[in-house]
Each structure stands twice: as structure tokens, then as C-alpha cells.
Amino acid sequence: INLMLDAGQKNEVKNILSARTMVRRNGDFLKAIDYTEYFSNEFSEIANELECAAHFATDDLFKDFLGWQAQALLQNNEEMDILADKHWARMQNTPLEFTISRENYEDKLTPTLFENTNLINRLNELNISPVPKDMLGIRVGIVNKKGTDLLLKFKDKMKEFANLMPKSDL
């Protein structure tokens, strides 16, 4: 990273330390590749399947969500991810739970950057914030309607429960 910064590759270092990239060696340096590009074949196959499912979907909100999610997989655009998530959030009465999400977990590599005080100070001076890499998670399930209804009842009572807690006045 220091070698790349010395060579004036600030933008590439910023991309390498972002959540959305795969990192590969490129000669003496490293190269960041957005995961929509790196996994373009796999994402394209998934997007095609989602678009096919949208064609047969009878629920308009679900159909819209599938279309937006397919586009999010094909584009190097975080806003598309957010738009797909917004369409999913609008669907409250669906019998299916279908989620494609980016999850960010602490990895073992990113914290090592903070152990090198010279490097982290240099990154801070350049306004580069290291971020752990994202993972994609896909989940499909059938909604437990009774369990969901019970959780919604608890949700409605959360303020009341909070007032019953010790030190609720803080």
C-alpha cells in the first residue's frame, strides 16, 4: 500500500480498501476490481434467473423487486443496491422471504492496517478509510405468518416495555 501511495496511486488504494472490491496482484502493485465486474458471469446468470422469475410472478411488488435486484447485480452502482432493498422493504405481506444482501463483517486483514501507525496516519491524511470487504448473502424462505404477527405485536409494545426497564428515564 505504501509503495502504491509513493507511486501516486491514491485512487487505486482507496478502491482496494473499499467494501465492494476483489483485490488482485498486478505486477508490483495491487488492483481493485469491483465485484460486479469480477463476478460478472455469475451475477449475469443470477440476474437472468431473477428476470425470468419476474416474468412469471403474479405479485406486482415482488415482480418489481426482482427486476430491481437483477439490475443491482449487473451494475457497478451502490444506489441500485439501495433501490432494490427499498423495493423489498415495501413488500410486507409476501409469503416468501427472499433476500440478496451485502453483509459487512470484520475480517482479519483490515485491522492489520491499523497496527501500522505510519500507514494509517498516511491514509488518514489522504482521507482514505479502510473498510472490511462485503460478502453477498442469499436467503430464501417461507414466512412464518403466526411468528411474524407475534413479532409485530411485540414491536407495537416496545415503547411500553422500554418504560418498564430500570433506568428508563435516562
Give the location of each predicted region.
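Extended, Lys/Arg-rich, non-catalytic nucleic-acid recognition/anchoring regions
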Residues: N2-M4, G8, E45
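Fold-level signature of zinc-dependent metallopeptidase catalytic domains
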Residues: N11-L170
